[in-house]
């Protein structure tokens, strides 16, 4: 479960890209990839058009769901999810407040899987935040998708070892 603020930019981009990488590895039928937000401020909105644009430009156009419905993570989603991938330290803190204690070990920041990034000190997880493209333009969305694509293979490798 990829998690961002409103479930219209980073988390749906992560969902689409991770699903693509799992399918490429032949694991698509064993892994269910979803996305959600920690806020309901964008409730019912589609994926941000700027995110859709960069996804199409990168070749994911056929994989963009037409029925995306931005939402805050639900109790049912929490119960059925084995891995939570918040995009930022702020998302991680908000998510941890929502989770029962038995689920907290299943929370790993998205970029924490990148072996090329230094492991942040406790309390400084924001050092590996995925860039927030919301207030930016095309460049910020390209940086965000670069960061998501860069880490996706490492997440897929890690999950494959857990299966």
Locate the predicted segments by residue.
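Short polar/charged helix/loop
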Residues: 1-163
């Amino acid at each position: 479960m990829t998690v961002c603020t409103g479930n219209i930019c980073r988390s749906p981009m992560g969902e689409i890209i991770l699903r693509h990488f799992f399918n490429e590895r032949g694991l698509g039928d064993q892994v269910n990839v979803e996305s959600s937000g920690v806020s309901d401020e964008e409730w019912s909105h589609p994926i941000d058009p700027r995110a859709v644009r960069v996804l199409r430009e990168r070749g994911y156009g056929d994989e963009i769901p037409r029925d995306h419905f931005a939402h805050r993570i639900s109790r049912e989603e929490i119960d059925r999810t084995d891995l939570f991938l918040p995009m930022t330290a702020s998302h991680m803190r908000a998510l941890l407040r929502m989770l029962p204690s038995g689920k907290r070990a299943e929370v790993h920041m998205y970029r924490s899987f990148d072996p090329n990034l230094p492991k942040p000190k406790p309390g400084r997880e924001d050092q590996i935040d995925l860039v927030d493209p919301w207030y930016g333009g095309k460049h910020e969305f390209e940086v965000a998708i670069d960061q998501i694509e860069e880490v996706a293979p490492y997440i897929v490798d890690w999950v494959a070892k857990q299966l």
